[in-house]
């Protein structure tokens, strides 16, 4: 893949009133991206912690490599996560292709699912060798399929096992090992179980944790319902930061804008993780993240980002990808802007058709730029 074909800072900003030149930029137009590619991988832990001030949640079927590439165009700084990859798939199934990613995605973390310490340690080693900046253990997913493998949110019931898993992974890799968890499951009292859980994993060497501020119900609720029905309890996450000041703690759950994220940072949390809002309205979240959350650079323009996606799409299609596998992540780029509906319609109706290529994306973009011009 030709490096540096994406727009970040260091290129000319395009104002909302101008048409974007839809071009595939050469490397020399994107010095910031070139520097990012040439930076050492994995990144130092302090750099990853800074990136974790705002992160995009790992989301099954959504945060694949194409999604992450798009998100990196929108924010130079935010920490990105893979979809959950199961340790058995890597260790027993040999599915190392699941670790494929582009160098432009960094900083990027690999989320693992599993409950066997030795197997997780080996999977973590594969992830570190692949160049991921962080290995994250999933202790929050409530789906039946995940529970059947004895991992995900059900691990909230086994803090000692989680600690053993963390210790085994840390012994195997040099990159930071982190945990994503809930505040509890089923009838557990979060005030009782969450401090014990954090104490155990901290003793095992975990220094950074992301807490989804809801309980998970392992029976009776679907994964989607578990994201909405259990009530949010932000206060307990802030309480855990006060009780465990040595831990880097990020909050996840229900945060739908940067305006909602900022108060949590101002109250003392180390980071905020945003999920569905970052996927469905990526421009509203990620294009503004660098100046508002990190105090760096300026907002990125989604029209220009589309132009710079064209080279990536060409490269990926030459390697066998289909257009819709990439453009499905781009549907929300112009949410709330004139032309957004037609942008989505052109891509949704045409991207799966035989012969569809970047010309369709250019046609879709005209639905936006033609109105904005």
At which residue positions do the language-model features occur?
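Alpha/beta catalytic cores of nucleotide-metabolism and tRNA/nucleoside-modifying enzymes
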Residues: 28-50, 54-60, 167, 172-174, ...
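Conserved, mostly hydrophobic/aromatic
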Residues: 56, 71, 83, 110, ...
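Non-cysteine beta-strand/loop elements that form the S-adenosyl-L-methionine
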Residues: 82, 134-143, 204-215, 274-277
């Amino acid at each position: 893949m030709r490096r540096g074909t994406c727009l970040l800072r260091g290129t000319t900003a395009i104002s909302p009133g101008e048409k974007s030149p839809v071009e595939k930029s050469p490397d020399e137009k994107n010095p910031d991206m070139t520097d990012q590619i040439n930076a050492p991988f994995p990144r130092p832990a302090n750099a990853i912690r800074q990136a974790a001030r705002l992160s995009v949640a790992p989301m099954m079927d959504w945060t694949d490599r194409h999604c992450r590439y798009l998100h990196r165009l929108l924010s130079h700084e935010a920490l990105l996560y893979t979809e959950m990859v199961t340790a058995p798939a890597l260790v027993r199934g040999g599915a190392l292709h699941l670790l494929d990613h582009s160098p432009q995605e960094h900083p990027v973390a690999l989320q693992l699912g599993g409950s066997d310490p030795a197997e997780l340690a080996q999977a973590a080693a594969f992830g570190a060798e692949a160049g991921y900046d962080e290995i994250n253990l999933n202790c929050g997913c409530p789906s039946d399929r995940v529970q059947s493998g004895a991992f995900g949110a059900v691990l909230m019931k086994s803090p000692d096992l989680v600690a053993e898993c963390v210790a085994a992974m840390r012994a195997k890799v040099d990159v930071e090992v982190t945990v994503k968890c809930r505040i509890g499951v089923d009838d557990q009292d979060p005030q009782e179980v969450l401090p014990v859980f954090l104490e155990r994993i901290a003793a095992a060497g975990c220094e950074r944790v992301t807490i989804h501020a809801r309980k998970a119900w392992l029976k009776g609720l679907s994964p989607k319902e578990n994201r909405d029905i259990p009530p949010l309890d932000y206060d307990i996450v802030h309480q855990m930061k006060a009780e465990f000041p040595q831990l880097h703690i990020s909050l996840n759950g229900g945060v739908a804008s940067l305006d909602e994220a900022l108060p949590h940072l101002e109250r003392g949390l180390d980071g905020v993780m945003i999920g569905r809002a970052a996927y469905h309205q990526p421009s509203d979240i990620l294009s503004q993240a660098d100046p508002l959350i990190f105090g760096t650079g300026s907002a990125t323009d989604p029209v220009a980002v589309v132009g710079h996606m064209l080279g990536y799409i060409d490269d990926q299609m030459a390697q066998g990808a289909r257009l819709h596998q990439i453009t499905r992540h781009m549907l929300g780029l112009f949410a709330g802007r004139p032309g957004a509906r037609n942008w989505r319609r052109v891509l949704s109706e045409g991207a799966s058709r035989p012969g569809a290529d970047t010309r369709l994306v250019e046609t879709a973009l005209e639905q936006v730029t033609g109105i904005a011009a």
